[in-house]
């Protein structure tokens, strides 16, 4: 029997500054596979929903890997499999982010601490 668990904990600086934990971990197990993820949030001030992004990343990895067929490992090269997985995970993550934004738009409250100079500095 395989036993597994995940534990995500908030760092001291986030507690001290009253910030939400931006990291996320999850696991999935069935008779064919065990998938364990650990996703780190973006960590910058401008990433106001980083805690959701890491959750979406974790869920995207699990969803894509659950859909992966064992036979694919015999049909394609390791490089092709990795490139395909990266693309599928990214597409799934983007879809999750877009669905979330459609359900809950970014509010002024979430971005009041940001100004244009700060945004352009971080993206430059």
Indicate where each model-derived feature is located.
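PP2C/PPM-type serine/threonine phosphatase catalytic domain
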Residues: 1-124
């Amino acid at each position: 029997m395989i036993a597994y668990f995940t534990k995500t904990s908030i760092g001291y600086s986030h507690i001290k500054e009253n910030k939400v934990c931006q990291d996320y971990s999850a696991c999935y197990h069935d008779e064919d596979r065990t998938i364990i993820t650990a996703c780190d949030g973006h960590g910058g001030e401008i990433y106001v929903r980083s805690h959701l992004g890491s959750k979406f990343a974790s869920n995207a990895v699990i969803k894509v890997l659950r859909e992966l067929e064992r036979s694919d490992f015999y049909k394609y090269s390791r490089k092709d499999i990795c490139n395909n997985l990266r693309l599928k995970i990214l597409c799934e993550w983007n879809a999750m982010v877009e669905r979330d934004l459609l359900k809950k738009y970014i509010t002024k409250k979430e971005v009041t601490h940001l100004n244009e100079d700060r945004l352009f500095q971080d993206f430059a």
